[in-house]
C-alpha cells in the first residue's frame, strides 16, 4: 500500500508518466476531468500536457490506453496548441492503437485522427495514415484505410487530398488479406463519389473481377455532387451563420463554400515536365549563327519541335533565350523571325512563371521588332509577347514597355499600345495600382494626339481598358486635360472591353451573382436529404456545432456509418441490370454436349465435324436458325461456343462455313448471357481469323459483340495479348485497326492504357509497315481521349517514327472524341445528370504520367556523393551536384525516398559560390518534377530554405529561387508552405529583396486558393511592417498582397491585428485596409463554375462532342432547361423572373432559357447607319486587313452584341468550326422568317462571313457560300441595294476565294458574284474584280479576268471603270502573264470586247508587245463569232436598263434582272471560248421566273417562236459550236409549275428541225451540267430518253438519207445528243430512274448506231463511234443494275428471234452482258435477283437448250452459262431462294440448271472455266485457234524487233488491236525489257495520233474526261423508220403516237384522239415475257405536252385579246398560226 500512497500524492502530469499502470489510469482520468473543465482554449494549462499526449495513446496497458485515448480526444478537440502534437500522436495511434483487438480503442483512435483533421491538421494526419498503409500488420492497414475513408466522407476532397491516396489504391487491391481488399473496395467507392475519372483511370489495372465488382457499386451511387457533412473549425462559424440565415429566409453571402466544385486532378499537374535543353542539337548554337538562312531555319525548327511539349522542365534557358532573341531582333529573314517568336511562345507557355526571369530581356526586342509589317510576323510576335506577359507581371516589364512608347515608328507605337491594352485585360485594380498606371497613362495620352490614326486608336483602346479595370476614380486624375470628344472615345472603348477575369467587376456584380446561392442550397438540400442520409448516416453534429459548444465532445460527434454499406442499401434499387457481369465456371466438353443437344437439332451436332463441307455448311445454317429462335435465359452460351470450337473448330478450311461460324459467335454474344469464360474459348480463334481476307470482317463483328457483352477493357486486353503472342503481322495490324474503331464506338474511359502501351510499342518496332501504320492510327484515336501528354510515352522512339506519330496527332488536333455508341459508356452518359460533369472519356488521359514507373534512387545517393556535395573545394562540390543532376535526369520519375540528399542540398543553398547555388536550385526544380506530389514531405527541410535564397542580392539567383519555389508549389499546393511559423519567420527578416519576392509570390498564389491554414494570420504583423518599410518596392509589394490576405482572413481579423501597432501607424494601415477592402476579390475562385456545372451552363461542346442538327439542338436545349430548373433550383425561379431581360453576367443557365426562343437578329433603329458613321469618323477600325487580327474580331463581337442573339454570337465566335457550321445552319433556317433583322444586321453578317473566308475548314467555307447564295437571292427579291460600306468590307474578301484550288468553291463564288449584280451596280463591282487581277494567285487572276469578260459581255463597255481604255489596258497586260490560264482568260476577255466593238478594241488596249499582239490577233482570227453589237442593241431597245446600269441607286428588277442574269451566265461560259459565242435564242431558254409569276398558268414561248422570223427555217442556220454551255440562271427558283416547261423543252428534242432540237438539247444540257439544278430533271428521265431515241431514229431514217443536208450539222446534232446523255449518266441518281423498257430501246439504238456503216464514212465518224462507246460504258455502269441487265437479256432475246437482225448486233449485246458480268461482284447486292432470274427463265423458255445449240454461234449459250455461273458463285446456294417470281418452277429449265451448276461448283472452283469463257468471248471475231493467234502476234512482234520492219510491225499491231480490241498482248510484252515495252506503247500512240489528226473535228466534238464539252458527236443506230428493229409486226398504236408527235410539231390539234385508251394500260396486263418498249410509254407523256401546248395557246390568245395597242390581236395570232401550219406542211412534203 506504500507504493499506492506515493503515486497518489503526485500531480496529475506526473501520474500520467508513472511506471505503475494504476497510477497512469488515475492520471488519465483526472486529466480527462481537467480537460473538460477548461473553458478557454488558449489556457496555459493545456501546454503542461503538450508532451504527454503521445503517451496517452501509446500506453502499453490496454485498459489504461482506452482511458488515455478518451482524454487525448478531449484534449485535441479543445486545446489551441493541440495541432503541434499531430505528427507524433497520429503516428502513435497508427502503430499502437489500430493493432488493438478492442473495437472501442480503434474507434477512439479514428475519432482522434478525425478531430485533428477538424482542427486543420488534415495533411499531417493523411501523411501518417499513408505511412501506415506500408505496415505489415493487416489490421493497421485496414484501420488506416477506414480512417481515410471516413475523413474523406465527412470532410470532402477539398480537405483530404485525393492525389496521393489514388496512387496507393492499386497496391491495396493486390493485398493477400481479404479484409484489406474489402476495405480498399469501400474506400474506392467513396473516392469515386468525389472524383470519378481519377479513380477509374487508376484502377484499370486491378484484377478484372474486382474491377467489375467496383463498377457495379459505382453505378449504384447517386449522380449528384457530394457535400461534406463535417467542417473545419474555421468553417463551422460560417456554416452556423449560413444555417441561421437560411432558416430566417435571408440571403447568405458567405455560403458559397458549399457549392464549391470538387477539385479535380488537373491534367497539367500530372504531366511530367520535359527536359529539352539536353535534347537540343549539338550544333544548335553554331547553326543559329550560320550565314545560310536554311541552316538557321533547321536549328529553329528543332527548337520548335521541342517547345511544343506542354510542360517544360525548369532549367537554365538563358543561352537559348538569348539566341532566339538575337534572331528576333537582328535576323533579316522574316520567316525566321516568326519561327523564333513561335519558339519563345512555346518556351513561355511550357515554363509558365519559370520563364519570368527572361521576360525583361526579350520584351524590348519583340516590341522593337513590331516595325515589321508582314502579318505572319506581327501575329507571331503578338502571340509571343502575350505568352511572355503571362509569365511575369506588368510591373516587371513596365520600364521596357515605356521606353519603347517613345519610338518614332508608328507601327511600333501602335502594337505597343495594343499590347498594353491586352495586358491591362489580365490585370485587376490591385495589380494595376496608381503608381504603375500613372506612367502608362502619360505615355498613352501622348499617343492619342499622334498623327497616325492607328496609333490613336490603339491608345484609346489601352486607356479604355485601364478605365474598365480600375474605374473612373483612379483614371480620371490623369485625364484632366483631355478634351470631351477624346474622353468620350475612351469611355466608348471602355464599354467594349471584356476583361479576362470577368466582363464586369465590383461588389454589386458579386452580390448579384451570390444571391441565388441560398435558394439553390436550400433546393439541393431539400432534394438531396435522402442522399445525404444514405451516404453519411445520422451525423448532423458538425453542421450545428459552434466553437463554444465543447462539453461532451466525443458524444456529440456521433458515429459515422460506412458509406459503402448505407449508400449501397440506399441505392440498390437504382442499379442497372446491363452492367452486371455474368460469371460462370468452365464446363467440361461432356456437359457442353449435353446442354447443346437440348437446344440444337440432333443432325446439327452430328454434322459439326463432317468431312463434307456442304454438310458442315448446312449444319451451320441450322445452328444459326436455332440460335436466332432461342430466348436469352435458355441459351447455354458456353456450351454453344464449345460446340463451334469442336474439330475442325477454328481451323475450318472452307471460308463459307467459317463465316457462318463467326456470325453465330456474334449472335450468341448479342443474344445470350455471354460470360468471360465463354469469351476465352472463342477469342483465340477470332484473333487467328481477324487477318483473313474473307473472314476478317466477321471476326471483327464477333469481337465487337463480345466486347459489348464482356466490356471492352477486358476484351481488348485479351485480344491484344493474343494478337501479339502470334507472329502473324496481318492479324496484328487488323487487331489494332479493330481496337481503333472499338475505342471510338465504346469510349475510352475504362481502358487499361498501360497494357496497350507495351503492345503499341511492340507494334511500332515491327518490321511490317502495315503493323506500324495500324499502331500509329490507334495512337491517333487514343490521342483524341488522352491529349498531348500521350506523346511523352513515345519520346524514345526513332525520329522518323516520332514524326509519323506527330503527323497523326496533328490530324486529330481540334477534333472531339465521338460519343460512345456501344457498351456501358452509352448508358452511363445518358444517365448522368446534365450538369454533373460534362467531361468526356478523354479525361481518362489525365493520369498518363502515372503509367510511367517511378525509380528508387536512394541507393545511388551514397555517403561518398553526399560528402562530395559538402566538400571544401567548390569544383568537387560542383562535380557532386552534376552527379545528382545526372541521376535525376536519367531516372526522370523518382520515388520520394532520396536518402540524405535533402540535407546535402540544403547546405548548398547557402554556398558562397553563387553558381553552385543556382545549380542547386536547378536540381531542386528537377527534383520537384521528378518526384511529383511526393515532394511535399520535403517542403519544411528543403522548400523553406529556398525561400531564404529569395533574399539574395543577385537578380539571377533570386529568379532561379523563385522558379524553384514555383516548381515545388505546382507539385505540392500551398498548404504545406503556409502551415506553421516558417513563412512568417522568413517575412520577419528585414531583407528588402526577400520581402519583395516573397510578398510578390504570395500575391500571386493566394488568389488561387479557396482556403488557407489559419497560420496565415501569423504573417500579418510582418505584412504591416512591410507596409511601412523604407524600401518603396517592399511597400508596393505589401500593398499588392494586402487584398489577398484579406480575402482569406477577412477584414475583421486584419483590423484586429493592427491593435499592437503604434497609433500613427495603425491609422495608416487601417486606411490601407479600407482601400484594400474595396478591391478585395471574391474568395472562392470557382463557385461560379460549381454553380454553372450542375445547372447546365457548361459549354455544350464538352457534353456533346458530335454536334446534333441545329434544329434538334436548339429545341432540345429549350425544352430541357425547365426540367433542369425544377430538379435543381426551385428556389431560384422567382428570382429568375425578377432579373429576366437584364444583362446580369450570371453563370447560371437562367439567362439562356429565353435566349433561343427569340429572334436571332434584333432590329436596332438606325443601328447600321450609326455603325457606318462610326467607321467613317474613325471611331472604330475600318474593315480592311490582310488577315483578321484579334482587335477586328473583338470589334465585330462588340458590334454584334447589341443586335445578335447571345447564344448565336457564342456559336459564331466559338473556337470549334463545328459551332460555326451550327451557326450558319441556324442563320439559313431564320433567313426567310427574319428578313428585316437580316437586312438591319447585313453589314455585320457580311463581315463575319469574311472571317470565315480565312478559316481552313472546307465544310465551313462551303456552308458560308451556300448561305451567301440564299442571302443575295433574298436581297434581290426584297429589292435591297448594298451600301458602299457593306460592299467594300465584303467584296474584296469574296474575290480572294475565287482563286481557291477547289472547283466547287470557285463555282459557288462565281455564282455569288453573279447574284450580287442584282443588288449592287456592275460598274461598281468592276473595280473590285479588277483589283483581284493583281493577286499573286494565278487561279484568282484567271477567274477575275473571266468575270470581267462576263460583265462586259452582259453590260457593254459602260461597265468598265474608271474608263474603258484604262480598264482594257490593265486587262491586256495579262496577255503576257506566265500562267497559261491567265493568258487565255485575258485574251478571251479582249476577244469578247472585240466581238462587241470590233477594231476599236486595238485603240483601247494601247501598245502591246509584238508577241502579245500576235497572240491576240491569232485568237481573234480563230474566234468563230462575227462581231455583234448585241448588248448595244439591247441598250437601245431597253433604255431603262442602261440607266439602271449607270445609276447608283436604281437596280435591275424582276424581268430585266432575269435577262441580265441570263446574259451574264451565258457570257461567263462563253468568255473562255469565244468561238462558241453564238447566243442561245430567247425562244429556247427556260424562263422559270416568268412562268412562276403567271399565277399558275403555264406560259410556253411557242407563240413567240411563231412570230419571229419564220423564214429562217428555210435559211442555213449557224449552229453553235458545242463548247461550254450557257448556264440558265433560273433553276434556283424552280417549283412545281416548271414541269410543264421541261415537258415542252423535251418535246422539242424530237423536233424534225435540227436547229430546234439542238437548242432544246442545249437547254437541257445546261441543267444537267449543274449539280444543284440537275434534280429538276428528276421524273422526266424516261420522257427525255424516249424523245432522244426518237430523234436518233429520225436522224437515221430522214436526215442521213437527205443528201441536201450538210453532214456536219448531223455530226453536231449527234454531239449534242451524246453529250446530253453522258451528262445524264454521270448523275447516278438520275441515271437510275431510267426504266427497263427505255434502257432496252436506248441500248438497241446505240448498238445499231455503232454498226451503221454510213457513220464510218463521215469525216468525224470514228470520233462519233468512240463517243458512243464511252456512252454505252456509262449507261452500263451508272444505270439501275437490275433494269439494265434485264434490258440486255430482253434485247438479246429479241435480236436472236429477229431474222433481219445482224449477227454483229447480237455479239455487241453479248459483249455488254459480259461487261455486266464483270461488274457483278461489286453490284450483286444492289440487283433484284428475282427479276433477273425471271428474265433468264423467260429467255430459256423462248430458247430451250436444243434451240440455242442450233444457233450459228456458240456464244449465246456461253453467255447465258457465264452469267448464271457468276451469279451462283457470288450467291452460293442462296440463289435458289430467288426463284420466287417464276410461277411453275418445275417446268423451268432454270432451276435444274442452277442445281447442276451448284453441284458442279462444289467440287471445282470454276474460276478456270470462267477465265476461259471470258477469253473466248474477247476473241469473238477470231476464226483461228489460240495457237494461230499466238503465232500471228509472235510474227508481228518479231517485225517490231527488227530494225528494217519495225514501223510495219507497229502498224500491223495497231490494226490488229483496233480490230480485236479485247486482245491481251501483255504476255508478249511481259518478258521484254522496260525500254521495249515503252517503245511499243509510244509507237502505237504515234500511229493513233497520225491517223486521227487528218479528219479531227474541232476540240468541241470530243468528250474530255471532265465533260467540258456541251455536245458530243454520236452516230445513230440502224433503226427502221417504223421504230422497231426486231422484225416484229408493229401495231397501229405506234403509228398513232408518231402521228401525234408530227401533228404537235405542226401545231395541229390532237383532241380527237383523247377518247382512245392510253397505250400504257397495256403494260398493266401480264403480257408476254419481253419488256415493254419505250414507245408504249409515249402516250401519257405526249398527252401532257399536248395539253400544256393547248393551254399555252389558249391563254396566250386570251391575254392577247386584252392587251393594249402594240401587242398582237387574236385574229393576227390565228392568222400566224395558220400560216405556220401551212409552212410546216410544206416542209414535211419537201422532206418526203
Swiss-Prot record:
Residues 588-817 are annotated as: TOG 3. It is found in: Cytoplasm, Cytoskeleton, Microtubule organizing center, Centrosome; Cytoplasm, Cytoskeleton, Spindle pole; Cytoplasm, Cytoskeleton, Spindle; Chromosome, Centromere, Kinetochore. It comes from the Eukaryota. Residues 853-1081 are annotated as: TOG 4. GO terms for molecular function: microtubule binding; microtubule plus end polymerase; microtubule plus-end binding; ribonucleoprotein complex binding. Its main location: cytoplasm. The modification N6-acetyllysine is found at residue 48. Transmembrane segments: none annotated. Residues 833-842 have a biased composition (Acidic residues). Residues 268-502 are annotated as: TOG 2. Residues 1-223 are annotated as: TOG 1. Residues 501-579, 811-848, 1078-1156, 1420-1459, 1801-1822, 1893-1926, 1948-2032 are annotated as: Disordered. It holds the Pfam family CLASP_N. Residues 1078-1095, 1909-1921, 2002-2015 have a biased composition (Low complexity). The TOG (tumor overexpressed gene) domains are arranged in a N-terminal pentameric array with each domain composed of six (for the most part non-canonical) HEAT repeats forming a oblong paddle-like structure. Intra-HEAT loops are positioned along a face of the TOG domain and bind to a single alpha/beta-tubulin heterodimer. The TOG domains in the array seem to be structurally and functionally polarized. Differential functions may range from microtubule (MT) lattice binding and/or free tubulin heterodimer binding to potentiating stable incorporation of tubulin into the MT lattice. Binds to the plus end of microtubules and regulates microtubule dynamics and microtubule organization. Acts as a processive microtubule polymerase. Promotes cytoplasmic microtubule nucleation and elongation. Plays a major role in organizing spindle poles. In spindle formation protects kinetochore microtubules from depolymerization by KIF2C and has an essential role in centrosomal microtubule assembly independently of KIF2C activity. Contributes to centrosome integrity. This is Cytoskeleton-associated protein 5.
Amino acid at each position: 500500500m506504500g507504493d499506492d500512497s506515493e503515486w497518489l500524492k503526485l500531480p496529475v502530469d506526473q501520474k500520467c508518466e508513472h511506471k505503475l499502470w494504476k497510477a497512469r489510469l488515475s492520471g488519465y482520468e483526472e486529466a480527462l476531468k481537467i480537460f473538460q473543465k477548461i473553458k478557454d482554449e488558449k489556457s496555459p494549462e493545456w501546454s503542461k500536457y503538450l508532451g504527454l499526449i503521445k503517451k496517452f495513446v501509446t500506453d502499453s496497458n490496454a485498459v489504461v490506453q482506452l482511458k488515455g485515448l478518451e482524454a487525448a480526444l478531449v484534449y485535441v478537440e479543445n486545446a489551441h496548441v493541440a495541432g503541434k502534437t499531430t505528427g507524433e500522436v497520429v503516428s502513435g495511434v497508427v502503430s499502437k492503437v489500430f493493432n488493438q483487438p478492442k473495437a472501442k480503442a480503434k474507434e477512439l483512435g479514428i475519432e482522434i485522427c478525425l478531430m485533428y483533421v477538424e482542427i486543420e491538421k488534415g495533411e499531417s494526419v493523411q501523411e501518417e495514415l499513408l505511412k501506415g498503409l506500408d505496415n505489415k500488420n493487416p489490421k493497421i492497414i485496414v484501420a488506416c484505410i477506414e480512417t481515410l475513408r471516413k475523413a474523406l466522407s465527412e470532410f470532402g476532397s477539398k480537405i483530404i487530398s485525393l492525389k496521393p491516396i489514388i496512387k496507393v489504391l492499386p497496391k491495396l487491391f493486390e493485398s493477400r488479406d481479404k479484409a484489406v481488399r474489402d476495405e480498399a473496395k469501400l474506400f474506392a467507392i467513396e473516392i469515386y463519389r468525389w472524383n470519378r475519372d481519377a479513380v477509374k483511370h487508376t484502377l484499370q489495372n486491378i484484377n478484372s473481377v474486382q474491377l467489375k465488382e467496383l463498377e457495379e457499386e459505382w453505378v449504384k451511387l447517386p449522380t449528384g455532387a457530394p457535400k461534406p457533412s463535417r467542417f473545419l473549425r474555421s468553417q463551422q462559424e460560417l456554416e452556423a451563420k449560413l444555417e441561421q440565415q437560411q432558416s430566417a429566409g435571408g440571403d447568405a453571402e458567405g455560403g458559397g463554400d458549399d457549392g464549391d466544385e470538387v477539385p479535380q486532378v488537373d491534367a497539367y499537374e500530372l504531366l511530367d515536365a520535359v527536359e529539352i535543353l539536353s535534347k537540343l542539337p549539338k550544333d544548335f548554337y553554331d547553326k543559329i549563327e550560320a550565314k545560310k538562312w536554311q541552316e538557321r531555319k533547321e536549328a529553329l525548327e528543332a527548337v520548335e519541335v521541342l517547345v511544343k511539349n506542354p510542360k517544360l522542365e525548369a532549367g537554365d534557358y538563358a543561352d537559348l533565350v538569348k539566341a532566339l532573341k538575337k534572331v528576333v531582333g537582328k535576323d533579316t529573314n522574316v520567316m525566321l523571325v516568326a519561327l523564333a517568336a513561335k519558339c519563345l511562345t512555346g518556351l513561355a507557355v511550357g515554363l509558365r512563371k519559370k520563364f519570368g526571369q527572361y521576360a525583361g530581356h526579350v520584351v524590348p526586342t519583340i516590341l522593337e521588332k513590331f516595325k515589321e509589317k508582314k502579318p505572319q510576323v506581327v501575329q507571331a510576335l503578338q502571340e509571343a509577347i502575350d505568352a511572355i506577359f503571362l509569365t511575369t507581371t506588368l510591373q516587371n516589364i513596365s520600364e521596357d514597355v515605356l521606353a519603347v512608347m517613345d519610338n518614332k515608328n508608328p507601327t511600333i507605337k501602335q502594337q505597343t499600345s495594343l499590347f498594353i491594352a491586352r495586358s491591362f485585360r489580365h490585370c485587376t485594380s490591385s495589380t494595376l495600382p496608381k503608381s504603375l498606371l500613372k506612367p502608362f497613362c502619360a505615355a498613352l495620352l501622348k499617343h492619342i494626339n499622334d498623327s497616325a490614326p492607328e496609333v490613336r486608336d490603339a491608345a484609346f483602346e489601352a486607356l479604355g481598358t485601364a478605365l474598365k479595370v480600375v474605374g473612373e476614380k483612379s483614371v480620371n486624375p490623369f485625364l484632366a486635360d483631355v478634351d470631351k470628344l477624346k474622353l468620350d472615345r475612351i469611355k466608348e472603348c471602355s464599354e467594349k472591353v471584356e476583361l479576362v477575369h470577368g466582363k464586369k467587376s465590383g461588389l454589386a456584380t458579386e452580390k448579384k451573382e451570390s444571391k441565388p446561392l441560398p435558394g439553390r442550397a436550400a433546393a439541393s438540400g431539400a432534394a438531396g436529404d435522402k442522399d445525404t442520409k444514405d451516404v453519411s448516416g445520422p451525423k448532423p453534429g458538425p453542421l450545428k456545432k459552434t466553437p463554444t459548444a465543447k462539453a461532451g465532445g466525443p458524444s456529440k460527434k456521433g458515429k459515422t456509418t460506412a458509406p459503402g454499406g448505407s449508400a449501397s442499401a440506399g441505392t440498390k434499387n437504382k442499379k442497372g441490370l446491363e452492367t452486371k457481369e455474368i460469371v460462370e465456371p468452365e464446363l467440361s466438353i461432356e456437359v457442353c454436349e449435353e446442354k447443346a443437344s437440348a437446344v440444337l437439332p440432333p443432325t446439327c451436332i452430328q454434322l459439326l465435324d463432317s468431312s463434307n463441307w456442304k454438310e458442315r455448311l448446312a449444319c451451320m445454317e441450322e445452328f444459326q436458325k436455332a440460335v436466332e429462335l432461342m430466348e436469352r435465359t435458355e441459351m447455354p452460351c458456353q456450351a454453344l461456343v464449345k460446340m463451334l470450337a469442336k474439330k475442325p473448330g477454328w481451323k475450318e478450311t472452307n471460308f463459307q462455313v467459317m463465316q457462318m461460324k463467326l456470325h453465330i459467335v456474334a449472335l450468341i454474344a448479342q443474344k445470350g448471357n455471354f460470360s468471360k469464360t465463354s469469351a476465352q474459348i472463342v477469342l483465340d480463334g477470332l484473333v487467328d481469323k481477324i487477318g483473313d481476307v474473307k473472314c476478317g470482317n466477321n471476326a471483327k463483328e464477333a469481337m465487337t459483340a463480345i466486347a459489348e457483352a464482356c466490356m471492352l477493357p477486358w476484351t481488348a486486353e485479351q485480344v491484344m495479348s493474343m494478337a501479339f503472342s502470334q507472329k502473324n503481322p496481318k492479324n496484328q495490324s487488323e487487331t489494332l485497326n479493330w481496337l481503333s474503331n472499338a475505342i471510338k464506338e465504346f469510349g475510352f474511359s475504362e481502358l487499361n492504357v498501360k497494357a496497350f502501351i507495351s503492345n503499341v510499342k511492340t507494334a511500332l518496332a515491327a518490321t511490317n509497315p502495315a503493323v506500324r501504320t495500324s499502331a500509329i492510327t490507334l495512337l491517333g484515336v487514343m490521342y483524341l481521349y488522352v491529349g498531348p501528354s500521350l506523346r511523352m510515352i513515345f519520346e524514345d522512339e526513332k525520329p522518323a517514327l516520332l514524326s509519323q506519330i506527330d503527323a497523326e496527332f496533328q490530324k486529330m488536333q481540334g477534333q472531339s472524341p465521338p460519343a460512345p455508341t456501344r457498351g456501358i459508356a452509352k448508358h452511363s452518359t445518358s444517365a448522368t445528370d446534365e450538369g454533373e460533369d460534362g467531361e468526356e472519356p478523354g479525361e481518362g488521359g489525365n493520369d498518363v504520367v502515372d503509367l510511367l514507373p517511378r525509380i528508387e534512387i536512394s541507393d545511388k545517393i551514397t555517403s561518398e556523393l553526399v560528402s562530395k556535395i559538402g566538400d571544401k573545394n567548390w569544383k568537387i562540390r560542383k562535380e557532386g551536384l552534376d552527379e545528382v543532376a545526372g541521376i535525376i535526369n536519367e531516372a526522370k520519375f523518382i520515388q520520394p525516398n532520396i536518402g540524405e540528399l535533402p540535407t546535402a542540398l540544403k547546405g548548398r543553398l547557402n554556398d558562397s559560390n553563387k553558381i553552385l547555388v543556382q545549380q542547386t536550385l536547378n536540381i531542386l526544380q528537377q527534383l520537384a518534377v521528378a518526384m511529383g506530389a511526393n515532394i511535399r514531405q520535403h517542403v519544411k527541410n528543403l522548400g523553406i530554405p529556398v525561400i531564404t535564397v529569395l533574399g539574395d542580392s543577385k537578380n539571377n539567383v533570386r529568379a532561379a529561387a523563385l522558379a524553384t519555389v514555383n516548381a515545388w508549389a505546382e507539385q505540392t499546393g500551398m498548404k504545406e508552405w503556409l502551415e506553421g511559423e516558417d513563412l512568417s519567420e522568413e517575412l520577419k527578416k528585414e531583407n528588402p529583396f526577400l520581402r519583395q519576392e516573397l510578398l510578390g509570390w504570395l500575391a500571386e498564389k493566394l488568389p488561387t486558393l479557396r482556403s488557407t491554414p489559419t497560420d496565415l494570420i501569423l504573417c500579418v504583423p510582418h505584412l504591416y511592417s512591410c507596409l511601412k518599410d523604407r524600401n518603396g518596392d517592399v511597400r508596393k509589394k505589401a500593398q499588392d498582397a494586402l487584398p489577398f490576405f484579406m480575402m482569406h482572413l477577412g477584414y475583421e481579423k486584419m483590423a484586429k491585428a493592427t491593435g499592437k501597432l503604434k497609433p500613427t501607424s495603425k491609422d495608416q494601415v487601417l486606411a490601407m485596409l479600407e482601400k484594400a477592402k474595396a478591391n478585395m476579390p471574391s474568395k472562392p475562385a470557382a463557385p461560379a463554375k460549381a454553380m454553372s456545372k450542375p445547372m447546365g451552363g457548361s459549354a455544350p461542346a464538352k457534353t456533346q462532342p458530335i454536334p446534333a442538327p441545329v434544329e434538334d439542338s436548339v429545341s432540345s436545349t429549350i425544352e430541357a432547361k425547365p426540367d433542369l430548373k425544377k430538379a435543381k433550383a426551385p428556389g431560384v425561379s422567382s428570382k429568375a423572373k425578377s432579373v429576366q431581360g437584364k444583362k446580369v453576367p450570371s453563370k447560371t443557365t437562367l439567362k439562356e432559357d429565353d435566349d433561343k426562343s427569340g429572334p436571332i437578329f434584333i432590329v436596332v433603329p438606325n443601328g447600321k447607319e450609326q455603325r457606318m458613321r462610326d467607321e467613317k469618323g474613325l471611331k472604330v477600325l475600318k474593315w480592311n486587313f490582310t488577315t483578321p487580327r484579334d482587335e477586328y474580331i473583338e470589334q465585330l463581337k462588340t458590334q454584334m452584341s447589341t443586335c445578335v442573339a447571345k447564344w448565336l454570337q457564342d456559336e459564331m465566335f466559338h473556337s470549334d468550326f463545328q459551332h460555326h457550321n451550327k451557326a450558319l445552319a441556324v442563320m439559313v433556317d431564320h433567313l426567310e422568317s427574319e428578313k428585316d433583322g437580316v437586312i438591319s444586321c447585313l453589314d455585320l453578317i457580311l463581315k463575319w462571313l469574311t472571317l470565315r473566308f480565312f478559316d481552313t475548314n472546307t465544310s465551313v467555307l462551303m456552308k458560308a457560300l451556300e448561305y451567301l447564295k440564299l442571302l443575295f437571292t433574298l436581297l434581290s427579291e426584297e429589292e435591297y441595294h448594298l451600301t458602299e460600306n457593306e460592299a467594300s468590307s465584303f467584296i474584296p474578301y469574296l474575290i480572294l476565294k475565287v482563286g481557291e484550288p477547289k472547283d466547287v468553291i470557285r463555282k459557288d463564288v462565281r455564282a455569288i458574284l453573279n447574284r450580287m449584280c442584282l443588288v449592287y451596280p456592275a460598274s461598281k463591282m468592276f473595280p473590285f474584280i479588277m483589283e483581284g487581277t493583281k493577286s499573286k494567285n494565278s487561279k484568282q487572276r484567271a477567274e477575275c479576268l473571266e468575270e470581267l469578260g462576263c460583265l462586259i459581255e452582259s453590260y457593254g463597255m459602260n461597265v468598265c471603270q474608271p474608263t474603258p481604255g484604262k480598264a482594257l489596258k490593265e486587262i491586256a497586260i495579262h496577255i503576257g502573264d506566265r500562267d497559261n490560264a491567265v493568258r487565255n482568260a485575258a485574251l478571251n476577255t479582249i476577244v469578247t470586247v472585240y466581238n462587241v466593238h470590233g477594231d476599236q478594241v486595238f485603240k483601247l488596249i494601247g501598245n502591246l508587245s509584238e508577241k502579245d499582239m500576235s497572240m491576240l490577233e491569232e485568237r481573234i482570227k480563230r474566234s468563230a463569232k462575227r462581231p455583234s453589237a448585241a448588248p448595244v442593241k439591247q441598250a437601245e431597245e431597253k433604255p431603262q436598263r442602261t440607266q439602271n446600269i449607270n445609276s447608283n441607286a436604281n437596280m435591275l428588277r424582276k424581268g430585266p434582272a432575269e435577262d441580265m442574269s441570263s446574259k451574264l451566265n451565258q457570257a461567263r461560259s462563253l468568255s473562255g471560248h469565244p468561238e462558241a459565242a453564238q447566243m442561245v435564242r430567247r425562244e429556247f431558254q427556260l424562263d422559270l421566273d416568268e412562268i412562276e409569276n403567271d399565277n399558275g398558268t403555264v406560259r410556253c414561248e411557242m407563240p413567240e417562236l411563231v412570230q419571229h422570223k419564220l423564214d429562217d427555217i428555210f435559211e442555213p442556220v449557224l449552229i453553235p459550236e458545242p463548247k461550254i454551255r450557257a448556264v440558265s440562271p433560273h433553276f434556283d427558283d424552280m417549283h412545281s409549275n416548271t414541269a410543264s416547261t421541261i415537258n415542252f423543252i423535251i418535246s422539242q428534242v424530237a423536233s424534225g428541225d435540227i436547229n430546234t432540237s439542238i437548242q432544246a438539247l442545249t437547254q437541257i444540257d445546261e441543267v444537267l451540267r449543274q449539280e444543284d439544278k440537275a434534280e429538276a430533271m428528276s421524273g422526266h428521265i424516261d420522257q427525255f430518253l424516249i424523245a432522244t431515241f426518237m430523234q436518233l431514229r429520225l436522224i437515221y431514217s430522214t436526215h442521213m438519207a437527205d443528201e441536201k443536208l450538210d453532214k456536219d450539222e448531223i455530226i453536231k446534232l449527234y454531239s449534242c445528243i451524246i453529250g446530253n446523255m453522258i451528262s445524264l449518266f454521270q448523275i447516278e441518281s438520275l441515271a437510275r430512274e431510267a426504266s427497263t423498257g427505255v434502257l432496252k430501246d436506248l441500248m438497241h439504238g446505240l448498238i445499231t448506231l455503232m454498226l451503221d456503216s454510213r457513220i464510218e464514212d463521215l469525216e468525224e465518224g470514228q470520233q462519233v463511234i468512240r463517243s458512243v462507246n464511252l456512252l454505252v460504258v456509262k449507261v452500263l455502269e451508272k444505270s439501275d443494275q437490275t433494269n439494265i441487265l434485264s434490258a440486255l437479256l430482253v434485247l438479246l432475246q429479241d435480236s436472236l428471234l429477229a431474222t433481219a437482225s445482224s449477227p454483229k448486233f447480237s455479239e455487241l449485246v453479248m459483249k455488254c452482258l459480259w461487261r455486266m458480268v464483270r461488274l457483278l461482284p461489286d453490284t450483286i447486292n444492289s440487283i433484284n435477283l428475282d427479276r433477273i432470274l425471271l428474265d433468264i427463265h423467260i429467255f430459256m423458255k423462248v430458247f430451250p437448250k436444243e434451240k440455242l445449240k442450233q444457233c450459228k454461234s456458240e456464244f449465246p449459250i456461253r453467255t447465258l452459262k457465264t452469267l448464271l455461273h457468276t451469279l451462283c458463285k457470288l450467291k452460293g446456294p442462296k440463289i435458289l431462294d430467288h426463284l420466287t417470281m417464276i410461277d411453275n418452277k418445275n417446268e423451268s429449265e432454270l432451276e435444274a440448271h442452277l442445281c447442276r451448276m451448284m453441284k458442279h461448283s462444289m467440287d471445282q472452283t470454276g474460276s478456270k472455266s470462267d477465265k476461259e469463257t471470258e477469253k473466248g468471248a474477247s476473241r469473238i471475231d477470231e476464226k483461228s485457234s489460240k495457237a494461230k493467234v499466238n503465232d500471228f502476234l509472235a510474227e508481228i512482234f518479231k517485225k517490231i524487233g527488227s530494225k528494217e520492219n519495225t514501223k510495219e510491225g507497229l502498224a500491223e499491231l495497231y490494226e490488229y488491236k483496233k480490230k480485236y480490241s479485247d486482245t491481251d498482248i501483255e504476255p508478249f510484252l511481259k518478258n521484254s525489257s522496260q525500254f521495249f515495252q515503252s517503245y511499243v506503247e509510244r509507237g502505237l500512240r504515234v500511229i493513233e495520233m497520225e491517223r486521227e489528226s487528218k479528219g479531227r473535228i474541232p476540240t468541241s466534238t470530243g468528250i474530255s474526261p471532265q465533260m467540258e464539252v456541251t455536245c458530243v458527236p454520236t452516230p445513230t443506230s440502224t433503226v427502221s423508220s417504223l421504230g422497231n428493229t426486231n422484225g416484229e409486226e408493229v401495231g397501229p398504236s405506234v403509228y398513232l403516237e408518231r402521228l401525234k408527235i408530227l401533228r404537235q410539231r405542226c401545231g395541229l390539234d390532237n383532241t380527237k384522239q383523247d377518247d382512245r385508251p392510253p397505250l400504257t394500260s397495256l403494260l398493266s396486263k401480264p403480257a408476254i415475257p419481253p419488256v415493254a418498249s419505250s414507245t408504249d410509254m409515249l402516250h401519257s407523256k405526249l398527252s401532257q405536252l399536248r395539253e400544256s401546248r393547248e393551254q399555252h395557246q389558249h391563254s396566250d390568245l386570251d391575254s392577247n385579246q386584252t392587251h393594249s395597242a402594240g401587242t398582237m390581236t387574236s385574229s393576227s395570232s390565228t392568222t400566224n398560226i395558220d400560216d405556220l401550219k401551212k409552212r410546216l406542211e410544206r416542209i414535211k412534203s419537201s422532206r418526203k
